[in-house]
Amino acid sequence: MNKPKTTLVAALALASLCVVSSAEAQQQPAPQLPQAPNMTFFVTSAGPGKGADLGGLEGADQYCQQLAQRHGAGGKTWRAYLSTQAVDGKPAVNAHDRIGKGPWQNFKGDIVAQSLDDLHSDNNKLGMNVSLTERGQVIPGVGFAPNRHDVLTGSTPEGKAFPAGEDRTCRNWTSSTQGSAMVGHIDRKGLRDDAASRSWNSSHPSRGPDGGCSQADLRSTGGDGLFYCFAAQ
């Protein structure tokens, strides 16, 4: 005879417990993102998701700034390491000329280069275990699955823009279909042991069935639409 009453009491107790648990869950603070206020260099952990269409230099710079802000380094002026080619009367822009003078350090405080000359020499410390993301993470390279080592730069080994004509910037970072972008290798490795394969900023042009600039195209050759960000000030 007491079974319905017992069942009701148990149900009420369970409901009360669920309410308390829900309230406690709502009071839990959001996980704190890792902070690196002294960071002045990183590789984006992900791209905006539209292949090599970064919204031009302005969009890429804003993306760098947003990622840095999330991890405590937003007080600096961030620039994407990207060149653009001369077109429609607009002059070319060199990645070399837009990222400040250095020195630059990664999430962990490791110096990646002391100056522009150092950065564009064999003395720089860039590589898979040093070129970390804004979260302090390593980007997988050759030998890992997936391989994401291609980094968009549109630049020569000296950090300069390519001459007008053959596209090397996916239409100055506005195309996610036709075109091609020069990429570097974050891990300094490739299919061959040559200077291009070991280059952090000028290894090979992107390519693929969609035209060369889509997210799928970039992934097909070992990329993911990632790019370097430097604090210019």
What are these model-derived regions, one by one?
Residues 1-10:
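Bacterial N-terminal signal peptides that target proteins for export
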Residues 24-233:
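Secreted/extracellular ectodomain signature
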Residues 9-19:
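Bacterial N-terminal signal peptides
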Residues 5-6, 15, 132, 152:
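Intrinsically disordered/low-complexity terminal segments and short unstructured peptides
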